[in-house]
């Protein structure tokens, strides 16, 4: 008689570089189940502190275990030199999450290589990465943009979480340590929001094939999380998820949506229906919405909603990226007109992305307030508000960056 086989989806979460390894440490700490953790780093000392199931110290000859020095080229070379080892630990995976903090050397340079290997082995490959805080310096911001663009080419789906947006949902007294912990928590939510749909038996159950149908070759994805208690809690949590400050754009036009609703045993059918309806109205009319509901008595009277939207026309929602700061307000109104007014109302958050230009060259800093408070005649000038994206490519001013030996 044939031995019984394990038909569970094999999910592996790979933390690449310092930020990625910190993120999987957080996932292990909170007890994320049903996945295997792999830590990959050029910093041998940081690897020693990880609780991952598998640890790969790559670039031993290249860096002697001392890190990549915030140089993505070093991180990339280290990964290529150990390609066979990485292939070995990824074999047999149905789904691979590549998580990293973009902007440094190891995560930025190595994540695309790891993703390329995972995808070549036939695994559904999802990147979940953070964009660095503004205070981490221009060099990291520029390296992060290059790394994100490169990673997008190697994964099925890419979720980018801008760390600066965490400040908009944090207390002004938040410490730097807590800010980075918040970033780890959001990376956890991104991975958990997907894996729980597959690994946790639910009231309305989903499987790996459901998730794959939405996320395979989906391009950029947006993730929103929300929780609420009291009256209309499910709708409030869903509203919070689709208008989350973490979203870089609106989910309008998403052709694939993963929706997970978790609540206690008192979670009502009509509550679920109302929350799901709210999300479906925000997505494309013909969107493939994969929906799951999990009963977790540990939540008490709290309802949690996780929304992951993908499958945008063109692979990503680029039209909104320049107006991302107004995305929260835009969702409930017309997509084009309110973008300018909401950018005004969220000026404090917007300032985060404009700090470096203001320090280096006062000239761009002057028009910035003018555009925000200006008349509609200045409207057309608003979209080319791309300074944070890539005007610093050739600059060598790195005084804001952290010294390489600390990486």
Swiss-Prot record:
Chain positions recorded as GTP binding sites: 18-22, 105-107, 136, 140, 184
InterPro entries given in the database record: Cell_div_FtsZ, Cell_div_FtsZ_CS, FtsZ/CetZ, FtsZ_C, Tub_FtsZ_C, Tubulin/FtsZ-like_C, Tubulin/FtsZ_2-layer-sand-dom, Tubulin/FtsZ_GTPase_sf
Composition-biased stretches (Acidic residues): 396-407
Record keywords, A-Z: Cell cycle, Cell division, Cytoplasm, GTP-binding, Nucleotide-binding, Septation
Positions with biased composition (Pro residues): 381-390
Xref: Pfam families: FtsZ_C, Tubulin
Keyword Glycoprotein: no
Record's subcellular location: Cytoplasm
Low complexity bias locations: 336-348, 368-377
Annotated GO CC locations: cell division site; cytoplasm
Region of interest (Disordered), residue spans: 312-407
Record carries keyword Cell division: yes
Example GO molecular function: GTPase activity
Biological-process GO terms, alphabetical: division septum assembly; FtsZ-dependent cytokinesis; protein polymerization
PROSITE patterns in UniProt: FTSZ_1 (PS01134), FTSZ_2 (PS01135)
Assembly and binders: Homodimer. Polymerizes to form a dynamic ring structure in a strictly GTP-dependent manner. Interacts directly with several other division proteins.
Family the entry assigns: Belongs to the FtsZ family.
Function: Essential cell division protein that forms a contractile ring structure (Z ring) at the future cell division site. The regulation of the ring assembly controls the timing and the location of cell division. One of the functions of the FtsZ ring is to recruit other cell division proteins to the septum to produce a new cell wall between the dividing cells. Binds GTP and shows GTPase activity.
Protein name: Cell division protein FtsZ
Organism: Streptomyces griseus
């Amino acid at each position: 008689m044939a031995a019984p086989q394990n038909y569970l989806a094999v999910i592996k979460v790979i933390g690449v570089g310092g930020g990625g390894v910190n993120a999987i440490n957080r996932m292990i700490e909170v007890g994320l189940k049903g996945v295997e953790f792999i830590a990959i780093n050029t910093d041998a000392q940081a690897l020693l502190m990880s609780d991952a199931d598998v640890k790969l110290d790559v670039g031993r000859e290249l860096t002697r275990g001392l890190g990549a020095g915030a140089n993505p080229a070093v991180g990339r070379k280290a990964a290529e030199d150990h390609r066979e080892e990485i292939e070995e630990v990824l074999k047999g995976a149905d789904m691979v999450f590549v998580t990293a903090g973009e902007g440094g050397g190891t995560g930025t340079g190595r994540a695309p290589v790891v993703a390329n290997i995972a995808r070549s082995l036939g695994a559904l490959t999802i990147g979940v990465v953070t964009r660095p805080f503004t205070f981490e310096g221009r060099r990291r911001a520029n390296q992060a943009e290059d790394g994100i663009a490169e990673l997008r080419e190697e994964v099925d789906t890419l979720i980018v979480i801008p760390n600066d947006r965490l400040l908009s949902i944090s207390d002004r007294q938040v410490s730097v340590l807590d800010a980075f912990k918040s970033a780890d928590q959001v990376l956890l939510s991104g991975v958990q929001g997907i894996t729980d749909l597959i690994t946790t038996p639910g009231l309305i159950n989903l499987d790996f094939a459901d998730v794959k149908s939405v996320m395979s070759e989906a391009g950029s994805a947006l993730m929103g999380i929300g929780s609420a208690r009291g009256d209309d809690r499910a709708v409030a949590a869903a509203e919070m998820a689709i208008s989350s400050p973490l979203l870089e754009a609106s989910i309008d036009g998403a052709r694939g949506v993963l929706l997970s609703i978790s609540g206690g045993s008192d979670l009502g059918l009509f509550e679920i229906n109302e929350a799901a309806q709210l999300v479906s109205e925000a997505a494309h009319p013909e969107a493939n919405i994969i929906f799951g509901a999990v009963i977790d008595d540990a939540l008490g009277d709290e309802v949690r909603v996780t929304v992951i939207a993908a499958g945008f026309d063109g692979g990503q929602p680029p039209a909104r990226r320049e107006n991302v700061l107004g995305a929260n307000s835009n969702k409930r109104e017309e997509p084009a007109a309110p973008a300018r007014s909401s950018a005004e109302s969220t000026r404090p958050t917007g300032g985060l992305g404009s700090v470096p230009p203001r320090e280096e060259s006062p000239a761009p800093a002057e028009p910035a307030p003018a555009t925000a408070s200006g008349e509609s005649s200045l409207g057309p000038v608003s979209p080319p508000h791309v300074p944070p994206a890539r005007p610093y490519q050739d600059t060598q001013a790195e005084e804001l960056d952290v010294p390489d030996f600390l990486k």
